[in-house]
Each structure stands twice: as structure tokens, then as C-alpha cells.
């Protein structure tokens, strides 16, 4: 398992514990609406900035129970707080504070509201 994937798995575990919710590594099969909101964490891109520093892009997708256009809870504050807490307690050699941006908000195939957060970090490889 690469260090990138270890960090992604650590973020999944950290979010799951801090939000007290199940966090997925790929889009799950939804059996009932009680599973919403869905939180899916995936590795997007990674590249070496220098021989010792690696850049990692992670997408955190939140899919809410509500249909797009309604009022929905994208959990942005909760996710931001949980990621800050994870970072503060992280044992990884992360360079500086990671960036969290809202990358995109668009409906899923079945019309539910979906928000993608782009989490970027650099770490000592």
C-alpha cells in the first residue's frame, strides 16, 4: 500500500470517528435513505514536487438525502472541523496546513444534492 493510500485511509478513519458516521472509499450501493448523507473520500492526483515532498489531492464528496435545489446540509463546517482536528493530531509529516476548497456542487444521477470538497496537502515522502 502506498503512502498516499495510507493517508487517504487515515483520513477516512479520522472523519468516520470524528463525525460518528460511516465514510466510504467509493460510491456505495444505497439500500435505504437512512444511509444519507453519504461521505466518500477518494484519492485524485498525486505528484512529487521535489524528491522529498509529495502533493496529494483528495476528493471528499458529500451526497445528501435532499433533492438538488432544496435546502441541504453539505456538512461543510463539520467536515472542515473534522479535517482540522485530524491534521492537528496527524502523525504524517505534512508541510504547512492543507487546503480545503469546495470544488463542485452538482446533482447526482438520481437528482440528489452533491458537493465535492478538494483537500490538498503536501507531505514529506
Where are the language model's segments positioned?
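Short acidic low-complexity segments
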Residues: 24-33
